[in-house]
Amino acid sequence: MRKNFALIGPRGVGKSKISRKLSKITGMPVVSTDMIAVYEMGGISIPEFIQENEGDWKTFRDLEFQILVKLKTSRGIILDCGGGILFDLDTKGKEVPSSRKIDLLKSIAVVFGLSKPTEILVEKIQNDPTRPPLSAINSYRSIVENRLPHYRSVSDYYLEIDDLKVEEVCSRILHKIEY
């Protein structure tokens, strides 16, 4: 049975687009943690769910963990992870690396971290109404800057994809897993 692989990285880096292209190349199904979350939440969007929870991401972060638990026995999938998959909230509501989620993710899949320069990501996300709102306290820029070292440290392979075409990113990923 083929091994799973997971794509992690900040919002807007291209994880979903790259995972869909990888699926076309390999025939492996894509499993999106965000899409499973929407299903588990009864079909409401992530922004609506966060709004219903008065801006509190804790319940959503717990749901992400439960999704990873359900995927533990999956084989031969491409896991398209939401941008916050590596994180939980501490008792004060501050985002912190989640050892429970990180350990589980690494037991499920070979992890590929994807990154682009922060300015490119900020520009892409700023006015995208399909993206969940980020905390009023933290700007997207500071969230990305705080998360990047964790994406890098958790990744089995870390790719700076800057201006690479989707096909080139897929080629690099497939080369690493010797597909």
UniProtKB/Swiss-Prot annotation:
Keywords attached to this entry: Amino-acid biosynthesis, Aromatic amino acid biosynthesis, ATP-binding, Cytoplasm, Kinase, Magnesium, Metal-binding, Nucleotide-binding, Transferase
Which domain of life does the protein's organism represent? Bacteria
InterPro entries assigned to the protein according to its UniProt record, in alphabetical order: P-loop_NTPase (IPR027417), Shikimate/glucono_kinase (IPR031322), Shikimate_kinase/TSH1 (IPR000623)
This entry's Enzyme Commission designation comes to 2.7.1.71
Q: Which reactions appear under catalytic activity for this entry?
A: shikimate + ATP = 3-phosphoshikimate + ADP + H(+)
Task: Give the cofactor note.
Answer: Binds 1 Mg(2+) ion per subunit.
Q: In which pathway does it act?
A: Metabolic intermediate biosynthesis; chorismate biosynthesis; chorismate from D-erythrose 4-phosphate and phosphoenolpyruvate: step 5/7
Binding positions (substrate): D34, R61, G83, R147
CDD domains associated with the record: SK
Keyword Amino-acid biosynthesis belongs to the record: yes
Q: Could you tell me what this protein is called?
A: Shikimate kinase
Taxonomic path:
Bacteria, Pseudomonadati, Spirochaetota, Spirochaetia, Leptospirales
